[in-house]
Swiss-Prot record:
Assigned keywords, A-Z: Basement membrane, Calcium, Cell adhesion, Disulfide bond, EGF-like domain, Extracellular matrix, Glycoprotein, Methylation, Proteoglycan, Repeat, Secreted, Signal
Residue ranges of LDL-receptor class B repeats: 1175-1218, 1219-1261, 1262-1306, 1307-1348
Stretches the record annotates as Disordered: 346-393, 408-452, 1013-1036
SMART domains the UniProt entry points to: EGF, EGF_CA, G2F, LY, NIDO, TY
Domain Nidogen G2 beta-barrel: 544-774
Modification(s) after translation: Highly N- and O-glycosylated.
Organism: Rattus norvegicus
Quaternary structure and interacting proteins, as annotated: Interacts with LAMA2. Interacts with COL13A1. Interacts with EFEMP2.
SUPFAM superfamilies membership: EGF/Laminin, GFP-like, Growth factor receptor domain, Thyroglobulin type-1 domain, YWTD domain
UniProt protein name: Nidogen-2
Pfam families: EGF_CA (PF07645), G2F (PF07474), Ldl_recept_b (PF00058), NIDO (PF06119), Thyroglobulin_1 (PF00086)
Length: 1396
């Protein structure tokens, strides 16, 4: 059978149903191209237009599709290997970025793809044919044998990228690459669930990443991103909920070599559900509980790590531990909490299913006899053909997990249970070559497969857990049967009486997050995961250093001198991989410290707790965990002085440090200050019984001073009590007696520092008998060379390997901390913050949230009643006033615009009585508003009316220039008019050089009076020469380009990831945002490439850099005069070289009426505000370093009012009462003010400013507010309008406050923060702070009007509206010209009421 993708049909005579058989035949061969789902135009596929960044029209789905926990009715297909539930932004905003994206994304191969010039095609359709749905169902049931066993899709959506190529820069003489990719995505859904299939046929991936367009000549390639993202932006960029499958080129290469379905190249995922779905869940072949593996996972799965590890040349895999750090055991397919990169590993080549499984996979797997056995080591070369039998008396535990995981985690052997024989093993299993080898099912819960009934155990006994003393956990309702437990058997089915018994289901929260919970017949126990140790309730990483903090108090009789001290500090540091323990106690009085020198048990406790373990032994922490009581009684000889030491451990603090308090009471012999104590190496025997450890021994020590050497001794009796778990089988207990060997004991008191120090090196093992000395493995005596944060793995003889402990990464000889918060390897859930610690991390809930019982999930603290929502407020009716909630039961009332009063009572404002209309207009008052209409014989918007009369002079016989001149002169007679009056020569023709009389701008015109593009000059400069243009010349290289070329030559043409290369734009100017190599460490630069202080950011938040060089002029250019706006309220926004006009209908955006108000070529307009009294718009220009204004009258032209003393003017605010303007200058770090005509200029502030940006004014109350986005200490400040009473208003929980506005009606100060992604408001005094919206993209400026906020956004390059009441994003406007928008302001038809 063959598949003809071009024709879109099967080659006759084979029917489509045979495709199912072909795909699911019993083989492990790679997916072939003809095994893709059928596609082609004959199947109803639509074709995406050719291009580099194309997007399909919305595909309206017949039935909404579930993605994560939401439903969507539309899908969009993009050129760049991606599907979304909403239209895509420009590709530059996502195609070169890592996950998460800012929009919902389903990405089978996200890269910069280009189908221009017929390089491949992209097809898509919705399909309901039975053949396609049946094939999709088979795939899903294969990968999800439990939850997907009854999945019957009703609809499918298919997208196929066929022979598509990567975007390539056009180079002279270079032929396009012949590397083309083919892949397919299928979304299958029913009314409850959605599954995704990603299919990569053999040889279908010929390129594995693409170069960013901004990389210029740097040979940088970004690997394709594969995965899913819900698209919600949280406080930190990398905390949005997402699932990522790839992160390196090698992992992309292996997409068609590995699988989680059993066929290399085929992948399945559960991506949406009506039930709770924490994150995308990958498929698991043979995921039935009866065939799950029999040992706990040592760490979380990681697709990316497994794909990366599976190289084309070797099966060798080195575990870097980044995937191991903080996850508890989970099943394949379980999605972890939080927003982190989900780590799951799969391989298709070896993954058996039980022959008696009810959900046996239809996909083939090698027989268990073909499975290799691996020796436990740091790294192993895996040979699938190797067979290795276990020693006699051992059972080989075959790990029925995904074999790609075997690349990371080696096989494990455990002793066979006493008395176990072949007759008592699970029936139906294949005998592995007549060896004493058996595979056992896992009975742990499968979180990703909820509500699955569990079959009873039939003649089944579980082996010991791979780690001594651990038994695998079970599904709900099943208990582990130990050989010493009492059970009843009937018909070979075990039954139990579980009445009044604590179970893991209700008590799992008592276990450490690094432990699993196991149910036994009498209760539950906690057991630490592999690579951790402890008592299950407290677990710490193996090999990692540990710290102890505590207090020491004492009441001693030193000789005949009483000495007392209280709560002095104790700190201990333990290098656990070689058994060293260091203890320091500060501020103990000198006589007591000197006398306690021989009392080594004070610090010796930590040596026993974290001693090096010899095989078959356990140190103290493995027994006690972090809660115990250590009682010591020391009796000195010959004086019989007796002292008692009590050390109480109180658990682990949030940084995983052991907390311990010590109390010392009794009598100790006096030791003179000039004596030191020497203690020889010694052994102690510790006896274990139930929850008590005891030890008694005698010890001698020497007191030395010069030639004096005195030998004394004491007897030590120790008793350590703790709470052991009594439910586990007793045969799992530690040996009754263990020997602690202490070497290199050391005690010293430093009188200068006031610190008493102890140091010991410890090993614990079985009781030794005298025998001939043998070579000791360095792992047991601490002589290895592993890093202090690495585990030492003993090998044969004196061989060993080193492996970094969880929370660290490296080669084992050198390890560095893993920042789980930055890399995403953490379990902090939504509404929580991850805080990195050395070797670990902790989760903290955000404000307003608290931890749930699992200590990872943060749940909302129930808010107090909101009077504004429940209707219990006392404000005026909704149409007259609005209720403002201030937290708790506090609220205030504010009259709506057009009404006046207390807010509790509001009355209509008669605007007509205030003469708001033009003198030639009629005013009509309405409740809450008014309107103006020009009288007959006049035209205009009512606020300005002009006469309809024609100029008195006859127009007959006038040339165009003369006519326009006469008309302009007539209009100029009206007060306030700034229209240009054309200049004509003696013959009535246009003078080639035209200049505006009031503004000073000059330009050339043609014979029809039309401006010649590009000839306009600003005031004060040399007028243009109105003649033919000069011949073009080649542009010389700029400073940026020369610097870039020099560095690239220095780096040998290919810089490393950590080497800086300047980024230049097409004209050679420095790009305002510069970053260090591939890192997220970025900063802003000026036009000369100099870093702007205070702009350097940490990874996660890019600084908001504003360009200082205007883009080139695009011809033809429009005239620099005002196109009059429509009547009513509208928004004005700055967009680089133009000011845009966006009308409002109420509070809704009238997007179809939006247009350009004023074109200002050669400018970069940033700040903008409006003077409501004279109807003039003001703006700052960072390219021209000026502040200008223009009237909103027809034909009015810009007027520059401040031309000097500016470097980077950004924010601008107008006080229409006092006729004053205020602005920020981030180049000079100043805040200034001046009259609206530029006079009376004054610097208000020039200190304690780093990056001042937004500024706003409350003219009625006389307050000024501004933001400073200094990356080290962002803040919002306020002062009076005269610069008095300056103070910080907000400096907590803000990141990059770009936008600031004061609402004169609600009296609220509000700001938009691009760092925290929040829109927040507060009262003018800084109280009553509340969040309006916490999922913004990248806001720049914000303004308030009526019941909405409007902000410009740099991610969407548009204007976004946000409801004040609900906080929801209600609408957006994206201008046709896609570039960054800066300032925004609202233009009212009247001024807000009030007086100075």
């Amino acid at each position: 059978m063959s598949w003809d993708p071009t024709a879109g049909r099967l080659a006759p005579p084979s029917p489509l149903s045979l495709l199912l058989v072909l795909v699911l035949l019993s083989r492990v061969g790679a997916l072939r191209p003809e095994e893709l789902f059928p596609y082609g135009e004959s199947w109803g596929d639509r074709l995406l237009p050719e291009g580099d960044d194309e997007s399909s029209a919305a595909v309206k789905l017949a039935v909404p599709l579930r993605f994560y926990d939401a439903q969507f009715s539309n899908l969009y297909v993009g050129t760049n290997g991606i599907i979304s539930t909403q239209d895509f932004p420009r590709e530059t905003q996502y195609v070169d970025d890592d996950f998460p994206t800012d929009f919902p994304a389903i990405a089978p191969f996200l890269a910069d793809i280009d189908t221009s010039h017929s390089r491949g095609r992209i097809l898509y359709r919705e399909d309901t044919s039975q053949a396609v749905l049946s094939l999709a169902a088979r795939y899903v049931r294969t990968g999800f044998p439990l939850t997907g066993s009854s999945f019957t899709p009703t609809h499918a959506f298919l997208a196929t990228w066929e022979h598509v190529g990567a975007y390539e820069e056009v180079r002279r003489g270079a032929a396009p690459s012949g590397e083309l990719n083919t892949f397919q995505a299928v979304l299958a859904s029913d009314e409850s669930d959605t599954y995704a299939l990603f299919l990569y046929p053999a040889n279908g991936l010929q390129f594995f990443g693409t170069r960013p367009k901004e990389s210029y000549n740097v040979q940088l390639q970004l690997p394709a991103r594969v995965g899913f993202c819900r698209g919600e932006a949280d406080d930190l960029k990398r905390e949005a909920l997402y699932f990522s499958l790839t992160n390196t080129e090698q992992s992309v290469k292996n997409l068609y070599q590995l699988s989680n379905l059993g066929i290399p190249g085929a992948w399945a995922f559960h991506i949406g559900s009506r039930l709770a779905l924490d994150n995308v869940r990958p498929a698991t072949v043979g995921g039935d509980h009866s065939t799950a593996r029999s040992s706990a996972l040592e760490h979380s799965f990681n697709h990316a790590a497994a794909l990366e590890s599976y190289t084309e040349d070797s099966f060798d895999y080195y575990n870097e531990n980044e995937e191991d750090v903080e996850y508890p055991p989970i099943e394949p397919g379980e999605a972890l909490e939080g927003h982190s990169r989900i780590d799951v590993s799969f391989n298709s080549e070896v993954n058996p299913t039980s022959p008696d499984s009810d959900h046996a996979s239809p996909l083939p797997h090698p027989a268990p006899g073909n499975w290799p056995s691996y020796r436990e080591t740091e790294s192993a070369s895996l040979d699938p053909q190797t067979k290795q039998g276990p020693p006699v008396g051992e059972v080989e535990v075959l790990d029925f997990k995904d074999p790609a995981e075997l690349l990371d985690q080696t096989g494990t052997r455990t002793p066979a249970p006493p008395g176990a024989d072949a007759a008592f093993l699970t029936p139906g299993r294949e005998d592995l070559g007549n060896r004493d080898t058996q595979s056992y099912p896992e009975a742990r819960p499968v979180p990703s497969e909820p509500d699955v009934p569990v079959a009873p155990l039939e003649r089944e006994i579980l082996p010991n857990y791979p780690e001594s003393g651990h038994v695998p956990p079970l599904s709900g309702g099943r208990y582990v049967v130990g050989l010493e437990d009492h059970v009843s058997s009937k018909d070979q089915v075990f039954t139990y009486n579980g009445a009044n018994r604590e179970t893991c289901e209700h008590s799992h929260g008592q276990c450490s997050r690094h432990a699993f919970c196991t149910d036994y017949t009498t209760g539950f126990c906690c057991h630490c995961q592999s690579r951790f140790y402890g008592n299950g309730r407290h677990c710490v990483p193996e090999g990692a250093p540990h710290r102890v903090n505590g207090k020491v108090s004492g009441h001693l009789q030193v000789g005949h001198m009483p000495v007392h001290f209280t709560d002095v500090d104790l700190h201990a540091y333990i290098v656990s991989n070689d058994g060293r323990a260091y203890t320091a106690i500060s501020q103990i009085p000198q006589p007591a410290a000197q006398a306690l020198l021989p009392v080594l048990p004070i610090g010796g406790l930590f040596g026993w707790l974290f001693a090096l373990e010899k095989p078959g032994s356990e140190n103290g922490f493995s027994l006690t965990g972090a809660t115990f009581v250590h009682d010591v009684e020391v009796t000195f000889h010959p004086g019989e002085e007796r002292v008692r030491i009590t050390q109480t451990a109180e658990g682990l603090d949030p940084e995983n440090y052991l907390s311990l308090n010590t109390n010392i009471e009794g009598q100790v012999p006096f030791i003179p200050a000039n004596f030191t104590a020497h203690i020889a190496p010694y052994q102690e025997f510790y006896h274990h019984r139930d929850s008590v450890v005891t030890s008694s021994s005698s010890r001698s020590f020497s007191l030395i001073s010069g030639s004096i050497n005195q030998t004394r001794s004491y007897r030590i009796d120790q008793n350590i009590t703790y709470k052991a778990c009594s439910h586990a089988p007793r045969h799992l207990a530690v040996p009754a007696t263990q020997q602690l060997t202490v070497d290199r004991a050391f005690a010293l008191y430093s009188e200068e520092e006031g610190v008493l120090r102890f140091a010991v090196t410890n090993q614990i093992g079985p009781v030794e008998v005298d025998s001939a000395p043998t070579a000791v493995n360095p792992c047991y005596d601490g002589s290895h060379t592993c890093d202090t944060t690495a585990r030492c793995h003993p090998g044969t003889g004196v061989d060993y390997t080193c492996e970094c402990t969880p929370g660290f990464q490296g080669d084992g000889r050198s390890c560095v901390d893993v920042n789980e918060c930055a890399t995403g390897f953490h379990r902090c859930g939504p509404n929580s913050v991850c805080v990195n610690l050395v070797g670990s991390y902790r989760c903290e809930c955000r404000s307003g949230y608290e931890f749930a019982d699992d200590r990872h999930t943060c749940v909302l603290i129930a808010p107090p009643p909101n009077p504004c929502l429940d209707g219990s407020h006392t404000c005026a009716p909704e149409g007259q006033a609005r209720c403002i909630h201030h937290g708790g039961s506090s609220f205030s009332c504010a009259c709506l615009p057009g009404f006046v009063g207390t807010g509790h009572q509001c009355s209509d404002v008669d605007e007509c009585a205030e003469n708001r209309c033009h003198g030639a207009a009629i005013c009509y008052n309405t409740p809450g508003s008014f309107s103006c209409r020009c009288q007959p014989g006049y035209h205009g918007d009512g606020f300005h009316c002009a006469s309809d009369t024609v100029p008195e002079d006859s127009i007959s016989g006038l040339k165009p220039c003369e006519y326009q001149q006469r008309y302009a002169q007539a209009q100029h007679a009206h007060a306030g008019s700034r229209i240009h009056i054309p200049q004509c020569d003696d013959q009535g023709n246009f003078v080639p050089l035209q200049c505006h009389g009031s503004t000073g701008f000059c330009w050339c015109v043609d014979q029809n009076g039309h401006e010649v593009p590009g000839t306009q000059t600003p005031p004060g400069s040399t007028p243009p020469h109105c003649g033919p243009p000069p011949e073009p010349t080649q542009r010389p290289r700029t400073v940026c380009e020369r610097w870039r070329e020099s560095l690239l030559e220095h780096y040998g043409g290919t810089p490393r990831d950590d080497q800086y290369v300047p980024q230049c734009d097409d004209l050679g100017h420095f790009i305002p945002l510069q970053c260090h190599g591939k890192s997220d460490f970025c900063w802003c630069v000026d036009k000369d490439g100099r870093e702007l202080p205070g702009t350097r950011s940490q990874p996660g938040t890019m600084p908001a850099c504003i360009p200082t060089v205007a883009p080139p002029v695009v011809r033809p250019t429009p005239r620099p005069d005002v196109t009059p706006p429509a009547v009513g309220t509208f928004l004005l926004y700055a967009q680089g070289q133009q000011i845009g006009h966006l009308p409002l209908n109420g509070s809704r955006l009238q997007k179809d009426a939006a247009r350009t108000l004023l074109s200002l070529h050669g400018s970069i307009v940033v700040g903008i505000d409006y003077d409501c009294r004279e109807r003039m718009v003001y703006w700052t220009d960072v390219a021209g370093r000026t502040i200008s204004r223009a009237s909103l009258e027809a034909g009015a032209e810009p007027e520059t009012i401040i031309t000097s003393g500016l470097i980077s003017p950004e924010g601008l605010a107008i006080d229409h009462f006092r006729r004053t303007m205020y602005w920020t200058d981030s180049g000079l770090d100043k805040i200034e003010r001046a009259g609206l005509d530029g006079s009376e200029r004054k610097v208000l502030f020039h200190t304690d400013l780093v990056n001042p940006r937004a500024i706003t004014v409350d003219p009625i109350r006389g307050n000024l507010y501004w933001t400073d986005w200094n990356r080290e200490a962002p803040k919002i400040e306020t002062s009076s309008l005269d610069g008095e009473n300056r103070r910080i208003l907000i400096n907590k929980d803000i990141g990059l406050p770009n936008g600031l506005t004061f609402d004169p009606f609600s009296k609220l100060l509000c700001w938009a923060d691009a760092g925290t992604k929040k829109l927040e408001c507060t009262l003018p005094d800084g109280t009553g702070r509340r969040v309006i919206q916490n999922h913004l993209n990248y806001p720049f400026s914000v303004v308030s009007y009526a019941d909405h906020f409007y902000h410009t956004d740099w991610r969407r390059d548009g204007v976004i509206s946000v409801s004040k009441d609900s906080g929801q994003l209600t609408d957006e406007y994206l201008p046709e010209q896609r570039s960054h928008l800066y300032g925004i302001t609202a233009v009212y038809p009247y001024c807000p009421t009030g007086r100075k």
